[in-house]
Amino acid sequence: GSASAPSIFPLVSCENSNPTSTVAMGCLARDFLPGSITFSWKYEBLSAINSTRGFPSVLRGGKYVATSQVFLPSVDIIQGTDEHIVCKVRHSBGBKQKBVPLPVMLTLPPEVSGFIPPRDAFFGBPRKSQLICQASGFSPRQVWSLRDGKQIESGVTTNEVZAZAKZSGPTTYKVTSMLTIQEDAWLSQSVFTCKVEHRGLTFQQNASSMCTSDQPVGISIFTIPPSFASIFNTKSAKLSCLVTDLATYDSVTISWTREENGALKTHTNISESHPNGTFSAMGEATVCVEEWESGEQFTCTVTHTDLPSVLKQTISRPKGVAVHMPSVYVLPPSREQLDLRESATLSCLVTGYSPPDVFVQWVQKGQPVPPDSYVTSAPMPEPQAPGLYFAHSILTVSEEEWNAGETYTCVVAHESLPNRVTERSVDKSTGKPTLYNVSLVLSDTAGZCY
């Protein structure tokens, strides 16, 4: 065949960010005649690269193919400024050259996190636990040291660096180090420092048993009033007192008292340990609806060994709240939905009411519909009426039930309503809301209050 100049293609290696290794790149020349060819490699500044390896030309389909490889230390790529190197080819039918891009060594700094032990996590004799330090999200993968401050030599276990699991984006790495500490050293308010060095920079995280800006700022107390829905359903008022950021739970006490007659029976529940190593506790007491609605004040008192003095918070029914009765509308399923012969969706709109606390329930054949058959929105402000609220409830039934003529009733309870309750019903025959008295269904749950 006639003489033919080569076509040149770069061959780029995968990233290898181990600074002690080398990265191989290559240059492919193809479709040339005659078969004699010479490769050379240069940096961007045209200085020669000598660590090369050539392969003999191979005849394929009447023309020749040849490759050349070059080897560069990873550390040169990590720390160098070149973005490519140059592959030059000399051939009797014409010289050519091609830029071969260097692998991109993405640099991402580590995020260093410390995880402190909860107070109940110390075991044994002497009592011990672990501080955990994790560096994550960094690239390349080398971390020059991971150590705890004051150059602690014993009790430190550092895992291997590992790639973080992710579906997309650049590969990043993480490493975890554990330091075994004794309880008396931890409680002596020593500061432990985890230091991570990456690409010549030092990142660190402090940990101690003292309160710091990234640890809980102290025990907090929140009183929660009874909701109208719970008052309506149980015919009693439940007072709740939430205590958060407890380092330990064994010494916490929560008690409810009232203005008159003193102490209330208080039931306390303790949470599981939270991710930040703290606990929370809930103290609940029950009073009569009339007592709550009278405006009487109730006080939650909290004691704990970490508190210099008791915490108290008082709650009572808000006074002077504007009260507006809701308008209630029940809408039948749309004709388009029924034509699909699958399901029927009924809507109950509750509009223009205040305060926002409301209770909505669906009733069929005189019995409450199971709660998993309908969904009720949270109260939302009326867009055109400041201070008023609306909510809606959606009930889904089978198309057969609707077409059989079943009657469905939306029951709405709100403190502004006569007898606290109103209802609207709809069925296939009317296609529009009708009144249907179901108040007795719900009032049967009334309990005695002593």
UniProtKB/Swiss-Prot annotation:
PROSITE patterns for the chain: IG_LIKE (PS50835), IG_MHC (PS00290)
UniProt cross-references to InterPro entries, sorted A to Z: Ig-like_dom, Ig-like_dom_sf, Ig-like_fold, Ig/MHC_CS, Ig_C1-set, Immune_Resp_Modulators
Cited SMART domains: IGc1
Keywords (A to Z) from UniProt: Immunoglobulin domain
A Pfam entry, by short name: C1-set
Any GO CC annotation of this UniProt entry: immunoglobulin complex, circulating
Example GO BP: complement activation, classical pathway
Gene3D superfamilies, per database record: Immunoglobulins (2.60.40.10)
Keyword Thylakoid appears in the UniProt entry: no
Single GO molecular function: antigen binding
Superkingdom per UniProt: Eukaryota
Full protein name: Ig mu chain C region
